[in-house]
Amino acid sequence: MKQVFLSMGLVLGLLIFGVACDYGKSGGGTQTADSALMSPPSSAGRTDNDEGVGHYKQGHWDVSEGHFRKAIKADPNLAEAHYNLGLALDKMNKHEEATTEFKKAAELAPTNPAIKDSPILKKHIAM
């Protein structure tokens, strides 16, 4: 009986270890090419931007668009909200509007690698 419990414990431990090792590979905690960005804690548009990020991750493009627009209204210089709005607009095939937002994000945060090195932003700005 003791040997069965030890075997089960070993299998469970290996399973947990495998899941933990795979976490970084599957995007857990890493940014993909079109990941929405959280805003800095000091931003007046933080709540709406971060709410928009949640909806964006769920594929609710139109709902996230509304939150990103509110965030920009609260803080017009919030580069992350402009970038995120560009992502949402791109998903809804509103490419001209998306390009405008990506350009604004790049203008506001020229040294932010999450924005300036974004493949989707580069694709739009090259259009």
Predicted ranges, named:
Residues 57-58, 91-92, 124-127:
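Register position in tetratricopeptide repeats
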Residues 70-73, 106-107:
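Conserved structural position within tetratricopeptide repeats
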